[in-house]
Swiss-Prot record:
This is Protein NEL. Residues 272-331, 638-693, 698-756 form the VWFC domain. Residues 1-21 form the signal peptide. Strongly expressed in early embryonic neural tissues (brain, spinal cord, dorsal root ganglia); less in other tissues such as cells around cartilage, myocardium, lung mesenchymal cells, and liver. After hatching expression is restricted to neural tissues including retina. Glycans are attached at N53, N225, N293, N298, N517, N615, N635. GO terms for biological process: cell population proliferation; commissural neuron axon guidance; fertilization; negative regulation of retinal ganglion cell axon guidance; neural crest cell migration; positive regulation of cell division; positive regulation of neuron differentiation. Gene3D superfamilies: 2.60.120.200, 6.20.200.20, Complement Module, domain 1, Laminin. The gene is NEL. Keywords: Calcium, Disulfide bond, EGF-like domain, Glycoprotein, Repeat, Signal. Residues 65-228 form the Laminin G-like domain. Residues 397-439, 440-481, 482-522, 523-553, 555-601, 602-637 form the EGF-like domain. Pfam families: EGF_3, EGF_CA, Laminin_G_2, VWC. One of its GO terms (molecular function) is protein kinase C binding. The lineage of its organism: Eukaryota, Metazoa, Chordata, Craniata, Vertebrata. It comes from the Eukaryota.
Amino acid sequence: MESGCGLGTLCLLLCLGPVVGFGVDPSLQIDVLSELGLPGYAAGVRQVPGLHNGSKAFLFPDTSRSVKASPETAEIFFQKLRNKYEFTILVTLKQAHLNSGVIFSIHHLDHRYLELESSGHRNEIRLHYRTGSHRSHTEVFPYILADDKWHRLSLAISASHLILHVDCNKIYERVVEKPFMDLPVGTTFWLGQRNNAHGYFKGIMQDVQLLVMPQGFISQCPDLNRTCPTCNDFHGLVQKIMELQDILAKTSAKLSQAEQRMNKLDQCYCERTCTMKGMTYREFESWTDGCKNCTCMNGTVQCEALICSLSDCPPNSALSYVDGKCCKECQSVCIFEGRTYFEGQRETVYSSSGDCVLFECKDHKMQRIPKDSCATLNCPESQQIPLSHSCCKICKGHDFCTEGHNCMEHSVCRNLDDRAVCSCRDGFRALREDNAYCEDVDECAEGQHYCRENTMCVNTPGSFMCICKTGYIRIDDYSCTEHDECVTNQHNCDENALCFNTVGGHNCVCKLGYTGNGTVCKAFCKDGCRNGGACIASNVCACPQGFTGPSCETDIDECSDGFVQCDSRANCINLPGWYHCECRDGYHDNGMFSPSGESCEDIDECATGRHSCANDTVCFNLDGGYDCRCPHGKNCTGDCIHEDKIKHNGQIWVLENDRCSVCSCQSGYVMCRRMVCDCENPTVDLFCCPECDPRLSSQCLHQSGELSYNSGDSWIQNCQQCRCLQGEVDCWPLPCPEVDCEFSVLPENECCPRCVTDPCQADTIRNDITKTCLDETNVVRFTGSSWIKHGTECTLCQCKNGHVCCSVDPQCLQEL
């Protein structure tokens, strides 16, 4: 439970004062009837006279209707309510006798975030809501609201503090677990019903309002006292302190980490660099790599194609490629016998006598140079080849490439008879005419691939790949055929579905006895599963603990079947789906609440005044009871005293405030019991036993919509006992034994909490804000606060009434 205002009454004692003429800021007010646009909005709801003439009133009759806010209107409501913990529900109503209906409901899927209900069957007002621990909770207020009379009702919620007023009288004030108002998208708002099929309110409603402000009941009853500050104010102050503590702890941790990093940074200078082909480049440094301009940016090499500029060359020069460079540059030239030669280029000329003369281009002139001595060739003369740039011959097959070449990446050197040339590798094209630089050919984009149907072409350096489309498998490098996912078990069908192969995919169909879309199939039970049971296979129900039968329709009586052995001072009480050991009359629990009743101890009725002995007798305490003893020599009447009134011995009467309970006086003892409903008795009181009314034969539809119940039938659903009466479903929380302890836990799949001694195991704690914890960094934490343990990322710690409880989140560890 969230921390209340210290003790439950602390908020009331801080500041009291009358407030007169209380005004309401329109931005904090939701006038539900006006916003919904009744009566034209919903068929079957009509305007009628109300308690007063200041606003419209509407009759909600016993007919099918759908009074639901549009998504746009609902979102206007929720924008004011979302994540608010200080608001008041106001309504003026006149509810039909015995009707059990919902005044309004805010719910999403199966979760009721806020719902106000009035039960005429059990004479209760119920508030259903979601808690901060994401559990459903119902707060029950015994009160007769469905009496066909006008009432003004207000329910003020301030964090964990509830105040219920009826007709400007404070009826109840409680400290409860704080509601969770983080309303998700898709939440719906209903008025006068829970949904299209359940919770129909029958009667008249007027002045239905939601005020997002503290103590909004003042607008309905201006003469009431107002508390200051409210519990929500108090919660806010505590929360702010917790947040500041958490910020302080996180800031301290960050400063410590920053200091450690600064100490390391002082010892070195770090600069991002890039590495390419064994060379290291500094940040923002640029260089040329073949026919690409590259730059080091943030430690990554970024390159783009080099664009060569065609400039005019001066006289006696021309453009020519230079080794190691992509673009042509101006080079000196020589003109010799009508041909152009570049600087350093050689040419042979043979005289008429057959002598070889060697010329070389130098300083714009072809100059004769001495010829080199020629090596002796080891091949026949027929295999000897003359060269244009040397007076020496070579043998056929000479390897010019080993003597050096200018072929770059993606280009290979190839030998001809008299020289070496460059050639682009397969899958690459030349960037210039000498093939020294080459680029990849995108066969996919240019349509130069052989990929067939059912494939996708993917370009690779120097080649391409044919990838099979989804649902197909490979035949060869270029072809794919249909893939039968059903045969290879590569489908997403549910285990309870049949797989049917299709072209390029497959279909899933649920097996007989299951329903769903094929990827998700749920078992179907034709008779349904009652009392919270789950259908796990075709017509097979898995029953919750405490129930049995094909449809979980039978409650297991643990008390009569001998499963339970209660202490001699306790009785075994069988309840739908479970049991508990309850102290016998004359005993009460000592506060330990042991499961078997060992903590029951005797009540001294005589000392506490909880006896019914008349004045002419003497009360004598017994183990588990008392005795009204007549003093020696006196003639005692055997009368009883009940609610300060004398009841004669043998007298039977009906309680004034409960016509369905009968009491009797027997020799000084008063015994009361609930009236037994015998529907065979023609004089049965139909007020107390409405299930015996033959006129009320309407059936009820189960909440799941799969089952129908007759009037008078009962069942269990989500830890609530439900009953069908007059065609209406009325549900109330299962009775739980009192748990008056500091720490309690609600076990999984159970409906009632149990006491535990270890606060770290508890999910509900009576928080005491005076008890604090000291975390690992010596920061003081308030009870209820939580934090991530210093030096970890996945260890969450909480302060629970002075105890530090830490646990590791496995999902967090997986995400690291």
